[in-house]
């Protein structure tokens, strides 16, 4: 039987077998801007469920991202070398207070994968969460990581030198975030409760905000993309029963 509430989709006849498929979409769990939806379906006595997350930024952070492309709680270094028209600010104090990394734990869909997994499957539209005691290096053997994803870690996240991530990704860390030399991020939101470093020759389209120091090394290209502030919707996955 279907849960109460939610949206019931009109019943469909399945052929062969003349089964009736009943399905509904339900909001199951919500906390700190993260909503979990379940699509439950039954046909011929079988039931299955898919889940999907919608991850929205706290309003305070969204407002900040609308004002600045780069913003730091402590110091901001190197932003003056970027192309004109990029709004940036340093010494803003604790600007990411409304962001709690631990809030993502209950919604975790995947562990941080290995080089070869990134290589083969890309980010796959999932929320990756890690609360371990080691920093995470995001790398693929070919240096290409396709697909959208949200990477959240208690410790630092390092994007390896030369890595190309063309699709929408959100990177959130309680530690530091480092974008390696000559790395290319096609559409990225970087949020660190500590420091962010964009190494020389890297190219980023998006927005970067941190509570600590933000360092932009030489020959970096940083282009504003305000669309990274929109809610991130994960791909449908089979629900873990």
Question: What residue spans do the PLM features occupy?
Answer:
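Membrane-proximal N-terminal amphipathic helix
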Residues: 1-5
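Short, ordered "entry" segments at domain starts
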Residues: 13-146, 151, 155-165, 169-228
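Short, low-complexity, Pro/Ser/Thr/Gly-rich segments in the mature regions of secreted, periplasmic
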Residues: 228-241
